[in-house]
Amino acid sequence: MELKQIGPKTFCIEHDTNIGIHFTDDGRMYLIDTGSKGDGEKIDEILSREGWVPSCIINTHTHIDHIGGNEFLMRKYGIPAYCTDYDMAFAHYSELEAAYMNGGYPAEKLRTIFAHPGMIGFRSLEKET
């Protein structure tokens, strides 16, 4: 993972799934996506090194390679994660992602490949904006 500045207040942690970091004018830091399982700890190392504390996580969608680090970072920093109402269903029922990718209810092995932490505190982007 490598941190790169891509704008005056915007950074990217380059990885298999890029992680966005954006600072608001009032100094809040938004973390955009958190990679796969185990990436939360790696992201935290970068944040700690820079002295940054996230205000929240915004997930572009709830595929496992975008929310895998959520649980660790949410617990460590006591922050919420936001997603769209549409993706809230996928967050509630992780087998939906496997069914969506498979074109029907998936076999057992596919259900476990796409398994993720489920509802670990997602909030609706639509309802809070």
Regions found by a protein language model. Name each.
Residues 1-50:
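Conserved beta-strand hairpin/beta-sheet module of binuclear metal-dependent hydrolase folds
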Residues 46-129:
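Active-site HxH/HxHxD metal-binding segment of metal-dependent hydrolases
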